[in-house]
Amino acid sequence: MDDSGAWVRRLRDGIVPPLWPFVLGSVGLLAVAVGVLVFEAAYVQVPSSGRGAGIVLLPLLGAVCCVIVPIGAWRDSRRDRRALANARAARDERPSFHLPVSARGISAPQDLSDPRTALFTVDRRGLFGWSPRSTDPVVTIPWDRIERIDLATKDDRGRRTAYGIWLTTTDGPVVLQPRSALGRPFEVGPAKLDVLRSVLRSSRP
């Protein structure tokens, strides 16, 4: 996977994708899940245990997810837009890249001044973490403090799987868990993590 895809260009430009296609897809899936439940209630005699319970639970869980996920996306979109506004108001230099992250997945040598860090901007000076509440960077990692940029890995059923970006700094390791896009709650997979690592490495002056 190269770094010229549309998702990478949106991160370079700091674009939050519109929510309506995402919401429409969720509404469509919700309608399907509800339709399956109605069909089962009207025409299918479901056993009280075993596989029969799964026939009811699967569409029910699908319906619940179709409600919860769009709400999470709306919340993340609002949070990221505020963090972006703070970053743009505070910096006189346009970032070369925007890296949305999972706030709960950040690991740093020192406690963050704001645990709700939503994204990092990247420019010739380094990486700067932003939250929706602060007009100043809540995390600052200059390039001269970054020694290496690697993939963070973990053991997953006997296999090493990439789950984040590992920054080896002079103050200790910093681990970031990127999200797939601004305004989206989903974390990226190993293939996209490799692209993000390459983008960060190429951003170093």
Question: What is the role of each PLM region?
Answer:
Residues 29-37, 62-69:
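Alpha-helical transmembrane segments and immediately adjacent membrane-interfacial amphipathic helices
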Residues 1-22, 48-122:
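Anionic N-terminal interaction surfaces
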Residues 112, 116, 123-162:
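Phosphoinositide-binding peripheral membrane targeting modules
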Residues 39-41, 101-105, 152-155:
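Short regulatory "switch" loops immediately downstream of catalytic or recognition motifs
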Residues 35-55:
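Membrane-interfacial hairpin junctions
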Residues 121-123, 166-167:
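Short beta-strand element of the conserved SAM-dependent methyltransferase core
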Residues 147-205:
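Acidic, Ser/Thr- and proline-rich intrinsically disordered linker/docking segments
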Residues 25, 54, 62, 126-129, ...:
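Small side chains
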